[in-house]
Swiss-Prot record:
Name this protein carries in UniProt: Asparagine--tRNA ligase
Protein encoded by which gene: asnS
EC number annotated for this UniProt entry: 6.1.1.22
Cited InterPro entries: Aa-tRNA-synt_II (IPR004364), aa-tRNA-synth_II (IPR006195), aa-tRNA-synth_II/BPL/LPL (IPR045864), Asn-tRNA-ligase (IPR004522), Asp/Asn-tRNA-synth_IIb (IPR002312), NA-bd_OB-fold (IPR012340), NA-bd_OB_tRNA (IPR004365)
Family the UniProt entry places it in: Belongs to the class-II aminoacyl-tRNA synthetase family.
Length: 454
């Protein structure tokens, strides 16, 4: 029997004999009774097993070290006077596999820095068990959200010849030691994808509502708490949709995911609130229960200018139209001014991607970023440029290889009305939901500069 089943069926199992196999989290010998705390990975909550000298295998059980595997046969009994509602009184304990004495994860607290060095073991700790349970649940919630709304899930390619962001920070894919791409596997320069958006946009023209959810890669030599070389992106795309539709979809999705975690992972959330970020649950409640605000980029610039005039200190205090807002500016807007998650719209075209729809003022594009208290930008999206001539002109302005993107640009020639979508960095979302302060702690095996240990 799994420990999760014991907790789910505890009232039906009272005084019933059960058998389970689990891992030892702690083992303490007492004068008259001894206590073993077990978990088999099926639930966040540990199960207490009580055993005595008359328990079959008693001497063997006493020797069970942390992380050893045991088989327990015993009865479920109520313990209303204790912290837990019930426990298992063991009739027999078998030590199936003994962990080594210097097992790296002992009962003492370990730093996250140390645990990153043993990423193959850290999921056994309470902290990372909670984080990765929430990550799993959030991934399921994303698929459920889009599936319930009629979206088609597509698998965009991992290997591509396109750089959707135009930043040139892609990992090259090659079978050669030289740079002769014509003789390479694909007979051209290839790289790992930085975004599935362009391919999603093509499929949206066939299915109307699509989304990708998969790994993306950036060869950005940045050793910060927010950057990783490999991460996951959620990228929906909706044909015949504009920026207003996009904003509504973002708000609905973010609230849905948080609500799902509250419903299905409350225990893990409470642990994160206690151990990772004090006030986490209040923060998430404010997001899921509030109406998101909308502010234009131009309005945001004026707000920031006024803040500087009133004496507020920003690290970057030269606030002018064209500034690429930093985290400090984003957090000021949503935390100090709007006091709510905030959509900032209509950014200058010079600081946004080539494929975004140009507004009538010829200065801004129909872009949107969702800013949330605590971290700043969480989601970035836009309505896409639907005018072929404008798109080609913009590609030339920013030195995008038109021939390389011919297939994408030509979508506008085959019946193209509107399209809008966004990208949400999955790890950044998990950081926000769990209170984890470093992206390395929300990815099972993080890939960062100078780090490829596993």
């Amino acid at each position: 029997m799994e420990i999760k089943q014991v907790f789910e069926q505890n009232s039906e199992l009272i005084d019933q004999e059960i058998e389970l196999i689990a891992r030892v989290r702690s083992n303490r010998q007492g004068k008259f009774v001894s206590f073993m705390i077990l978990n088999d990975g099926t639930t966040f909550t540990d199960l207490q097993v009580v055993y005595k000298t008359k328990t079959k295998g008693y001497e063997q059980a006493l020797q069970a070290r942390v992380s050893s595997i045991v088989k327990v046969i015993g009865r479920v009994v109520l313990t209303p006077e204790k912290q837990q509602k019930f426990e298992v009184q063991a009739d027999a304990i078998e030590l199936i596999d003994q962990a080594i004495e210097d097992y790296p994860l002992q009962k003492k607290e370990h730093t996250t820095e140390y645990l990153r060095e043993i990423a193959h073991l850290r999921a056994k700790t309470k902290t990372f068990n909670a984080i990765f349970k929430i990550r799993s649940a959030a991934a399921y919630a994303i698929h459920k959200f889009f599936n319930d709304r009629g979206f088609v899930y597509i698998h965009s390619p991992i290997i591509t010849s396109n750089d959707a962001e135009g930043a040139g920070e892609a990992f090259l894919v090659t079978t050669r030691e030289d740079a002769d791409y014509e003789k390479d596997f694909f007979a051209k320069k290839a790289s790992l994808t930085v975004s599935g958006q362009l391919h999603a946009e093509a499929f949206a023209q066939a299915f109307k509502k699509v989304y990708t959810f998969g790994p993306t890669f950036r060869a950005e030599n940045s050793n910060t708490a927010k950057h990783a070389a490999e991460f996951w992106m959620i990228e929906p795309e909706v044909a015949f949709a504009d920026l207003k539709d996009n904003i509504q979809l973002i708000q609905d999705m973010v609230k849905y995911i948080i609500n799902y975690i509250f419903k299905h992972n409350r225990r893990e959330l409470e642990f994160c609130n206690e151990h990772l970020e004090d006030g986490l649950i209040d923060k998430l409640n404010s997001v899921r229960n509030s109406e998101f605000k909308v502010t234009t980029y131009t309005e945001a610039i004026e707000i920031l200018k006024q803040a500087v005039a009133n004496g507020h200190k920003f690290e970057v205090s030269d606030i002018e139209f064209g500034l690429d807002l930093g985290t400090e500016h984003e957090r000021y807007i949503c935390e100090q001014v709007n006091k709510a998650p905030t959509f900032v719209t209509n950014y200058p075209k010079e600081i946004k991607a080539f494929y975004m729809k140009q507004n009538e003022d010829n200065k801004t594009v129909a872009a949107v970023d969702l800013l949330v208290p605590g971290i700043g930008e969480l989601v970035g999206g836009s309505q896409r440029e639907d005018n072929y001539e404008k798109l080609i002109k913009r590609c030339k302005e920013v030195n995008i290889d038109i021939d390389q993107l011919e297939w994408y640009n030509n979508l506008r020639l085959y019946g193209y009305y509107k399209s809008a979508g966004f990208g949400l960095g999955f790890e950044r979302l998990i950081m926000y939901i769990t209170g984890a302060s470093n992206i390395r702690d929300v990815i099972p095996f993080p890939r960062t500069p100078k780090n490829l240990l596993f």
